[in-house]
Amino acid sequence: MLSRSLLKNTLLLTGVSLLMSCIGMAFQAWLAVRLGAAGLGLCQLTFSVTGLCATLAVSGIRFASTRLIAEELGGGDGGSVASAMRRCLFYGAFCGGGAGALLHLLAEPLGFLWIGDARTVLSLRIAALSMPCISLCAALSGYFTACGRVWKPALAHLAEQLAGIALTAWLLTGSEPGDLERSCAAVTMGRAAAELLSLALMFVLYLHDRCAHYTDRKAGGALSGRMLRIAVPLALSAYTRSALSTLQHLLVPRGLRSSGLTADAALAGYGVVQGMVMPLLFFPSCLLSSASELIVPELTAHQVQGRSAEIRNTAGELLRLSLRYSLAVSGILFCCADLLGGLIFHSRDAARFLRLLAPLVPVMYTDMAVDGCLKGLGLQVWSMGVNIAESALGLVLLRFLLPRWGLGAYLAILYFSELFNLALSALRLRFFLCAAPSAARRPDAGSVRCAYTAGR
């Protein structure tokens, strides 16, 4: 059985995630009507590049701050929390500033040569301003997670989302519906301004929280070195995965153009799948994403105490929940594809692709649960390796199959990639759960402290 605290926190986070998902889906539907499929596709291409830069900006600091603060709190007296956070914030500011400067300097070559559309250059330059905000918010969010007060960053993210929507809607009133360059820039500017607001709110909450709970009563031991040993390996693996994923997204419109579609038709096809259908497929996943995140400290606690039976029971319960829930969601999306596509996006193409991709939901949702179990058992390196292998294989398939078979090949590659990822991850989890009980006993001490503290 899943523990009561896990169920309680899952329901709490699910409620917040559901509210934000509803707001985000409504805004995405409005954007689809306001920008059109081609405009939405142009925005998605821009976000794929800014997402890579955001990975450079964060550079593993979210988990590093969570782990480092949790280790300091593990002493029971608050340790040197403020000193640890100063290092995390400096690291975040350095990486965020560097990523922002790099994006600003390379905006033209990225827009012209990499994305292949000059209309994205202005948006890339605007997005560069938000990179320090993203990295600093990640460090602060990690602090609140370690302290067990996750409602504070959740409040900041909700305020960020609402402000971003309001600002974007206001900025779009100043651009013509057919001017995709200015429309995309307006969306990017709204997001960047909202990131700045989120940072200001989170920093105020952090200062109040730190003064209320923690003061440095002792010097931390080699805090900078400990932080870098956590952040750098995570950053390197995230760079690889994000770069491969970005290349995948950039290859799709080019491959569709090579298959015979015009530039706008290729952008429209990409925009329908990535900007309309995929958000709708992931919209109901908030329940499983919350459970998969919160099961990490639960499994680690069982692991350190050598409770092999509880590990198997907890993991099995989550996987059964994910399978039942995802099958129900898949059936509803498949049967109601025409209604949802027409009602939300006013698009027959969205309805058609939604029906084609609905059977993939059980695979995606179950993979989400399996990844949570692997991280809770200290097998996140395997999970990252599988994700990188999936992205690399998908990149090769897109390069050779998309120009020949168009959107049909793209959908087939999505199916193959998700099945490949789930198969390898599930086999690794099954092998671990079926291994000798001694294999489930000794995670590293830092992981244990982090798990216990995050689960409080």
How does the language model describe each region?
Residues S59-G74, L281-Q305:
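Helix-loop junctions and terminal segments of transmembrane helices
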Residues W170-P177, A193-K218, H249, D371, ...:
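C-terminal transmembrane helix end/exit motif
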Residues F63-E108, L122, S135, A309-V329:
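Membrane-water interface segments that mark the loop-to-transmembrane alpha-helix transition
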Residues G98-G116, A328-H346:
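Short membrane-interface helical motifs at transmembrane helix boundaries
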Residues M20, Q28, S59-T66, I126-T145, ...:
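Short runs within selected transmembrane alpha-helices of multi-pass transporters and secretion channels
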Residues S5-F63, G100, H104, S130-M131, ...:
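Signature of the first transmembrane helix
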Residues M1-I23, G79, S83, K218-R241, ...:
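N-terminal membrane topogenesis motif
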Residues N9-G24, G190-Y206, G221-L294:
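Transmembrane helical elements of multi-pass membrane transporters/channels
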